Amino acid sequence: MTICTLTSSAEQQINTICKEHNVIAVTLNLKGGGCAGFEYDWGTISDAQDIEEGDEIIATNEGFNFVISKHSLMFLIGTEVDYVKSLVGSNFEIRNPNAQSSCG
């Protein structure tokens, strides 16, 4: 079962963030709030000891990690994370088949 997949663009951006901020991982968690009941909470990890047992770890091609909190896993099954650049900016885009609705 695949919890989450990263596009090559998302993987490249995770590598860039980790290098620029001297961290080992970018994290994604869900927390209560937002217009659909949940909102995505992004973060970084600088020490491997901060990764909890049961967290989902996806290694990038440069040895950095994308970590999903064990508490968020069941809500993110089948999710694809992309990094999109446009004229108005750039951001991670989450395609979550489990989301009932989205903001905006």
Predicted regions and their residues:
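Signature of N-terminal electron-transfer/Fe-S-associated modules in redox systems
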Residues: M1-G104
